[in-house]
């Protein structure tokens, strides 16, 4: 939707949080969502100019930005839906630091690193663990082994559950000989998951935005009908 009349209605009906809402296709909205001027210029150039109405997939704009950030953006780690991972064979009073690349893309020519603290208790994503894994699941399961990104190999040994059967903590043992690379016996590990130290991470407020409409072409829908809007599902607020 690019019509100013339609967009104004979204603002006036409080379906969005203003003209600079990151879900809006306005320049101020794109800027708040993280789009750079160069990515927008490149998208316009790639799309070309036409006298006829043309529908351009939003994924093309996303791809242009992704290609730029892949080379320019420094990486940081966030765990948005955490569950605790306890390394049982790691000393409770120990902390060591791993050097992780700020940009691992070889084409970025960025050799700088950052130090990331590693401790006995870590946060990982809930979706990176499954008691009953689906087919081809390559992350952490009971008895399986994964690589903690930039750190050790760990094998899951058990879980703690609350009175409702919900997993509240995962137990694992680390192969402390794998700090600098692959295991000496040459065994293959299928997956790598990201993590942060419970003691050293920072609290953050995160808003996750999705597309505003379920329809790819809103021009086919009457202006008075917003039954396809799903604004209430396109913003997730996490703390």
Model-assigned labels for residue ranges:
Residues 145-148:
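N-terminal non-catalytic structural scaffold regions of very large proteins
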Residues 152-226:
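C-terminal, non-catalytic macromolecule-binding modules
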Residues 227-234:
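Conserved small/polar residues in nucleotide/adenosyl-binding loops
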Residues 35, 45-48, 66, 161-164, ...:
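Hydrophobic alpha-helix feature that most strongly marks membrane-spanning transmembrane helices
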Residues 238:
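Cytosolic catalytic cores of cyclic-nucleotide second-messenger enzymes
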